[in-house]
Amino acid sequence: MFKIKAADGTNNLCGKRIAEIRKEKRLSQRKLAIKMQLLGFDVDHYFIRRVENGERFVTDIDLVIFSRALNIPISELLPEDMAL
């Protein structure tokens, strides 16, 4: 199956932004995973790591949960240039 990757070869466009925002909010990957679990999303800190490192594809549902857990609009999770 063919899968589209970002220009930098990663599997998502939002991983770096998620890591930046998480660090700005002084959250560990484990604490972010717990916040997402409290929203009913079954994840652990390995999921967060894989997203941030660009190893995992991210769905629209993932974006919604990240935005709710980080208390930010979804648009802030995406890079400004959106280059593929």
Please identify what each model-predicted range represents.
Residues K23, Q37-L38, N53, M82:
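Residue-level detection of the helix-turn-helix DNA-binding "recognition helix"
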Residues L13-K16, R26-L27, V43, V58-I61:
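Residue-level signal for the short linker/turn that defines the boundary of a DNA-recognition helix
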Residues F2-G9, R68, S75-L84:
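Short, charged recognition helix plus adjacent turn
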Residues R26-R50:
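Short alpha-helical DNA-recognition segment
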Residues E55, T59-E76:
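DNA major-groove recognition helix of helix-turn-helix/homeodomain DNA-binding modules
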Residues K23, I34, R68:
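Alpha-helical residues within the helix-turn-helix
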Residues M1-K25:
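A short, Lys/Arg-rich alpha-helix, primarily the initiator
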